[in-house]
Swiss-Prot record:
Binding site for Mn(2+) 1: 270, 347, 349
Binding site for Mn(2+) 2: 265, 270, 288, 349
Subcellular location: Cytoplasm
EC number(s) reported in the record: 3.4.11.1, 3.4.11.10
Main localization category: cytoplasm
Biological source species: Rickettsia massiliae (strain Mtu5)
Enzyme active site: 277, 351
Top-level EC class as recorded in UniProt: hydrolase
Name assigned to this protein: Probable cytosol aminopeptidase
GO molecular function annotation: manganese ion binding; metalloaminopeptidase activity
Family: Belongs to the peptidase M17 family.
SUPFAM superfamilies: Macro domain-like, Zn-dependent exopeptidases
Length: 500
């Protein structure tokens, strides 16, 4: 794991040294001295705009021979227009620096920050750079037995010199804790589905949360049947692996404080059931539990900080498999709420899992606010691509706050519509509702949201986050490799911290 230290004295032993320069291409007094030590390499580089323009995110790595004859590397990072810098951009810059250092096989990095940059103190700026680098250091290669030497290389340490290392270290410690929660979310999402069965996943939740003071209850199929969870159980009945409902309760606030409930879809593997998916890219359905992973990761982050709030998490863990015992198109299930649902398509299973999970959360904990998170529909990816998750809500203030925080942490949300006409599209001739709409291909994400909305009680503020397009990526980003993104943890952690 990447080691990040904050120090009061500069070290001359680091292999790489990071220099920040904005689009004005001016050297302050500190950089002038450093430039002289390195034979004017910094000033020569920025004078040649074909090499370096100072635009945001531009990284230039230059080898330099110091007086001792040793080779050092100057890592010049562009800030662009300092007035346009945001916390998210600074974190991403930290990730880019780590990735370039890794590519150049630079094992130790030094970074000096003693001046305010734009509106950010040196301590805040340094902690954000460190956070981005730490997030970018994530790897999932536990099943690789033949890694090449280049693939094995990792930056060992980053040493950051600021004018108040103690304060900077405190700021980073919180960000590191949140990043480690993101790593859990990525890890469990990246795990192959033959490894992370509902039972194994539930055990991992217990192992990581109970030491943090979170009460965890793992409910099996017998108890779910007694509770009347016909919708969730119907999804999992085709699998030989028993479905689980995992309930997490963190009581950091006072007894009379309101509770927020997070509910996650945890379809461990989704074949589509009898309504079988095409085989192409079906392996990616191991990520169909990304919503549940985001919920667990958020509770790790909240409990790890010992935040003074009350929060519960409920995740339904199932496998949607075809078999002689699998749910059939046309089946009618009775949900925990007592409402019935006609299952017209067994591949619209996530909303069935959430129906019972959100109802359970409301019945047991009486939350003021429910936020469900799910890789729910392919339609949201058609609408928003891989840039935004969809946000549906019955409360404008709740939606606005979530969207604002999403912009701040670069886990973006786009408000999607709810309307009575969408709701009418899920009426069934033989049950209270159907699990798909009556107009093929129309408003798929909105239809799914309305299905869940029918299980939200009057007076409860609710938001549904459809993260199907952003939970995993087929390409690396500044903050991590391709695969599971860990989307939702930083968004929900900050929302909870600031607004509850």
């Amino acid at each position: 794991m990447l080691n990040i230290n904050f120090v009061n004295e500069e070290s001359s032993t680091n292999q790489g040294l990071v220099v920040f320069i904005d689009e004005q291409l001016k050297l302050d007094s500190n950089l002038i001295g450093l430039d002289q030590q390195h034979h004017g390499l910094i000033s020569k580089t920025i004078q040649n705009k074909l090499q370096f323009t100072g635009k945001y995110g531009q990284i230039k790595v230059i080898p330099s021979v110091i007086k001792s004859g040793e080779v050092r590397y100057l890592i010049i990072a562009g800030l662009g227009n300092e007035e346009k810098l945001t916390e998210a951009k600074i974190e991403e810059l930290g990730g880019k620096i780590l990735q370039h250092a890794t590519g150049c096989k630079i094992s130790t990095i030094g970074l000096k920050l003693t001046n305010r940059i734009s509106r950010f103190t040196s301590q805040t700026f340094a902690s954000l750079v460190a956070s981005g680098a730490f997030l970018a250091s994530y790897r999932f290669d536990k099943y690789r037995t033949t890694l090449k030497e280049a693939e094995k290389f990792a930056v060992e340490s980053i040493e950051i010199f600021t004018d108040n290392s103690t304060e900077t270290a405190k700021l980073f410690e919180i960000k590191k804790l949140i990043a480690e929660a993101v790593f859990f979310t990525r890890d469990i999402s990246n795990e192959p589905s033959n490894i992370k069965t509902p039972q194994v996943y539930a055990e991992r939740i217990v192992d990581i949360l109970e030491p943090l003071g979170v009460d965890v209850d793992v409910i099996g199929e017998r108890e779910m049947k007694n509770l009347g969870m016909g919708a969730l159980l119907g999804v999992g009945q085709g699998s030989q692996n028993e479905s689980k409902l995992v309930v997490m309760e963190y009581k950091g606030g006072s007894k009379d404080a309101s509770t927020i409930a997070l509910v996650g879809k945890g379809v461990i593997f989704d074949t589509g059931g009898i309504s079988l998916k095409p085989s192409s890219n079906m392996h990616l359905m191991r990520y169909d539990m990304g919503g549940s992973a985001a919920v667990v990761g958020t509770i790790i982050a909240v409990a790890g900080q010992k935040l003074p709030i009350n929060i519960v998490g409920v995740v339904g863990l199932v496998e949607n498999m075809p078999s002689g015992n699998a749910q059939r198109p046309g089946d009618v299930v009775t949900t925990m709420s007592g409402q019935t649902a006609e299952v017209l398509n067994t591949d619209a299973e996530g909303r069935l899992v959430l129906a019972d999970a959100v109802w359970y959360a409301q019945e047991k904990f009486k939350p003021k606010c429910v936020i469900d998170v799910a890789t729910l529909t392919g339609a949201i990816t058609v609408a928003l691509g891989n840039t935004y998750a969809g946000c549906f809500s019955n409360n404008d203030e709740l939606a606005d706050k979530l969207i604002k925080v999403g912009e701040e942490v670069n886990e973006k949300l786009w408000r999607m519509p709810l309307h009575d006409e969408y709701d009418a599209m899920i009426n069934s001739d033989i049950a209270d509702m159907a699990n798909i709409g009556n107009v093929p291909g129309a408003a798929g994400s909105c239809i799914a949201a309305h299905f869940i909305k029918r299980f939200i009680k009057d007076g409860v503020d609710w938001a549904h986050l459809d993260i199907a397009g952003v939970a995993n990526s087929n390409k690396a980003s500044a903050l991590g490799p391709k695969g599971a993104v860990g989307y939702g943890v930083r968004l929900l952690e900050k929302f909870i911290k600031e607004y509850t």
